Amino acid sequence: MNTVRATFLLVFVLAVSLGQADKDENRMEMQEKTEQGKSYLDFAENLLLQKLEELEAKLLEEDSEESRNSRQKRCIGEGVPCDENDPRCCSGLVCLKPTLHGIWYKSYYCYKK
């Protein structure tokens, strides 16, 4: 019975001592991995920052290429009076003289084509 207890105690002590060594090794491995992970995260962060800066530069470049004259001028909607000589009707509309209603106004209106 004593030999069984002694054997059990010996196995227990070896398991605990080897377990402690493994725990220290695991701790050191985890520290190394976190340091490597931090460097990887820094690298990924810098790469993402570069891509965002490139995208921002492209967007700003496109904005600067547009001039005020390239914007579409305001247009007149359907059924709104327009000038015969300078029609500003929206696309799909034409400046025409009214046929039935509004003939007493003697004005042109924007109508669908």
From Swiss-Prot:
Region (Disordered): 60-82
The keyword Signal is annotated on this UniProt entry: yes
Prodomain positions: 22-74
Subcellular location(s) per record: Secreted
Stored InterPro entries: Toxin_22 (IPR012627)
Domain of life: Eukaryota
Function summary: Probable ion channel inhibitor.
Protein name: U11-theraphotoxin-Hhn1a
The species this protein was found in: Cyriopagopus hainanus (Chinese bird spider)
